[in-house]
Amino acid sequence: MYISDRLKQKDNETFSFEIEKDRDFRILQLTDLHMGFGFLSRKKDRLAMTAIRTLIEETRPHMIVLTGDSTFPFLPKAGTLNNRRQAIKLMEFLDDFEIPYTLVFGNHDCEMGCVCSKRELAELYKKGKYCIFTEGREDLTGVGNFIIELTADSGEVLMPMVMLDSNMYGEGGWF
């Protein structure tokens, strides 16, 4: 979990992240990376990582937000079902930038037959050196439903960021 004087966890579903009120706060939002970290996805993973590195260098964000499908443990595409390894590799990659990041799960982060459940992945992501993540409330569908309040040093909430798990496939299968 990201540790900073600027970040406080208020409860199991709310963080407070202090930003400078009179300065633009840049968020780099990335979605559907589908990082496989398997033998079938090596080339695509390298291309994606190069693109992400370039985006970070050019935008110099204060926070990175991953909005689902960051990994893709699908055997025909990645060559692996090991989403635990994928999550660890993704965290290692992002932690190297030393920029706080947060994420939500999409429908591909835990494909059928994969190694870890969302709850198990949540425990992993909470260990990321720069990751801001919590499971959120138990009475809401999904894992990782939480709020990051971007606040001024006075405590005034300048902008709430609501992070929601988009969940998996509907009842009855994939479609």
Feature names for model-found ranges:
Residues 1-84, 89:
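N-terminal active-site segment of His-dependent metallophosphoesterases
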Residues 2-19, 85-175:
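Extended active-site neighborhood of metal-dependent phosphoesterases/phosphodiesterases
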